[in-house]
A protein has these predicted regions:
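Short beta-strand scaffold segments in enzyme catalytic cores
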Residues: 15-19, 142-144, 149-156
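Short glycine-rich, Thr/Ser-proximal phosphate-binding strand/loop in the N-terminal lobe
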Residues: 2-50, 54, 77-79
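Solvent-exposed alpha-helices and their adjacent loops that cap or buttress functional pockets
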Residues: 10, 132-138, 143-146
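Short beta-strand-loop/turn "lid" adjacent to the catalytic site in phosphate-handling enzymes
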Residues: 55-106, 111-124, 143
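Flexible, charged surface loops at secondary-structure boundaries
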Residues: 1, 56-59, 135-137
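Short coil/turn connectors at secondary-structure junctions
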Residues: 2-3, 101-102, 137-141
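Conserved A3 ("GATE") glycine/threonine-rich loop of ANL adenylate-forming enzymes
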Residues: 12-14, 110-115, 148-150
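Short, flexible, glycine-rich and Lys/Arg-enriched loop motifs at helix boundaries
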Residues: 117-137
Length: 156
């Protein structure tokens, strides 16, 4: 059985939306992502509505959002999430009502990258420096990179 989830990467300049299909075996596939400029939308809710219209008016009842900034901890999101270079405000307590979803997940954008790295196959990596070895099955994964600021995440 496939489950569909709206996945969103929200930064200071862009919000990228896609539909992820998750197979019974855990395999994830994405449809073609759509990039919306945050400056073109007064709020995340209006960007969501624009994406929903592009998808024919119906979206899955679950959303997973990777957000550029602090989101709180699992099960205890920040009551108000603000962006550095984007006037949007997300209030997790209102997500289900405002977006018409039944479930949501919030994660920092670089934490999302760290989770993706943990699932990646060795063939998806490009060796740049240091020992040329496959990623270990255990241990800490660190991800660092530029975005609106300098993003860092560790996955244990």
């Amino acid at each position: 059985m496939m489950r569909d989830v709206v996945v969103v990467d929200i930064g200071g300049t862009h919000a990228r939306f896609a539909i992820a299909s998750i197979g019974a075996d855990g395999t994830i596939s994405l449809d073609e992502p759509e990039t919306l400029h945050t400056a073109d939308h007064a709020s995340f809710q209006t960007a969501w509505q624009a994406f929903r219209e592009r998808k024919g008016g119906t979206l899955p009842k679950a959303v997973s959002m990777a957000i550029a900034g602090p989101v709180g901890s699992p099960g205890k999101p920040n009551p108000v999430i603000r962006f550095t270079n984007n006037p949007w405000i997300i209030r997790p307590a209102l997500i289900n009502e405002k977006l018409g979803v039944e479930r949501y997940t919030l994660v920092n954008d670089f934490a999302a990258v760290a989770h993706a790295v943990a699932r990646a196959d060795d063939s998806q990596f490009l060796h740049l420096a240091g020992p040329d070895q496959p990623l270990g099955a255990e241990g800490t994964i660190s991800v660092i990179g530029p975005g609106t600021g300098l993003g860092v995440a560790h996955l244990y």
